[in-house]
Amino acid sequence: MEYNKLSNEIIAKLQALVGVQNVVTDAGQMEIYAHDEVTDPAYHHMPEAVVFAENAQQVAAVVKLANEYHFPVVPRGAGTGLACGAVPIYGGVVLSLEKMNKIIEVNADAMYAVVEPGVRTSDLQAAAAAKGAFYAGDPCSGDSCFIGGNVATNAGGNRAVKYGTTRHQVYAVEVVNPTGKIVQLGARLQKQTTGYCLEQLIIGSEGTLGIITQITVKLLPLPKYSMDLLAVFEAPEDAIGTVNKLIMAGIMPTCVEYMDNITIKSVERYLGTSLQGSEKGNYLIVEVEGTSEDDLDEKACTMDEICSENGAGDVLVAEHDKIWQARKAFAEAVRAESLIVCKEDVVCPVDHEPALLAEILRLADKYQLVTRIASHAGDGNIHLNILKQEQEDYADWDARVKANQQELYRFIYAHGGRLSGEHGIGYKRKQLMEEFTNPDELEMMRAIKKALDPNNILNPGKIFDIE
């Protein structure tokens, strides 16, 4: 793909649009915008400029200029992505939305909030809770990621098993389209069948079809009663195999999370702490909400019985803060062990999850890969982290990782799965997307991209290539 470089004339025009203070061209200051949370330098690409937008009008003006001068624009939130979705692989402008960070409205009576894309997810949760309401989106990076990035990637997280992913929390979005027009998509309605559902098209499109500048999200009543159970299993397949049994028993958990024992030990080292039952096996962390203490007790008894019948050696009431700190420290603990990690985000139907985990373990042994595994087990989403060891040759390690991927993805697609559950495709998984996705699906996606972004300005080279 050919794009024009940013000339002094273009830089001056950008400065006129957003202010001199909001345009950065110094290489040292731009380095952090050359990558997301993928630490492998092979995936890093420097922008030619970083532009900080303060409102939708500035975003629109930058996109119009990009179409006029034919340079790429890569929207960026907090940079916490794991698929290189905000990496400027063709240079051009990284358009940062971090200054668009206002919580515009929290309406607990009508159960909605309106926010800008640069609002931290945990800040939205706190603002809702302060009004007695609840925002259900809960990615593990909630203390650092932005709500705009959540929408752009359709982020999942711990509570997706009960409340769904980000797309289930969004009523409407304001978007700057690829030609620079500000458009309103969706409405604060519980249902509608009024033409195409365009706001849902934008959600999960990773900045390739529009730049999100405002979001109206759904709020729920703040849960009054909840508890966390920790079931410890010696056998990984028993832990994962219990998930569907819990759901089929009529218990709808808020969260069901899996951590294998070696990952638990890694997190203990990273946090410098000792976790309940860590010496006994693999974790299944189950959070459940109830209408009363008695309701919780009844659900806890049922879960204890099901877990014990299916191989749990211990079923404990978990220390809430400590167990969730441990689960959410997974990524940081892995990073502390190795800076070069292949992070897989595979997803399959929940009833196929035990078979998928068994295949992951078989392939890791076959290709002699060091792994750390955690899972949003309640929705079939397994996070397989493959760590390069210091003594391993990079080329040899990378070849084994790629061979593992080929077998793994063939297995996943044969079992009705997909290669990403919540992290997105970005640049990192683009080749695999094109290799394993149904050609008819890809053709439809490309047709949409070409129709909405005829100059291929917005986040080019992500998800798939334009032929």
Feature map (PLM): residue ranges:
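Alpha-helix capping/hinge segments and adjacent helical runs
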Residues: V20, Y413-I425, P454-L458
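N-terminal flexible segment immediately upstream of the FAD-binding catalytic core
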Residues: M1-K64, G81-M111, C140, T263-T273, ...
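C-terminal substrate-recognition/cap domain of FAD-linked oxidoreductases
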Residues: D26-H35, P221, V232-A235, I240-E407, ...
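FAD-binding subdomain of flavoenzyme oxidoreductases
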Residues: K102-E257, L458
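Activity-critical C-terminal alpha-helical subdomain
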Residues: K181, R429-E467
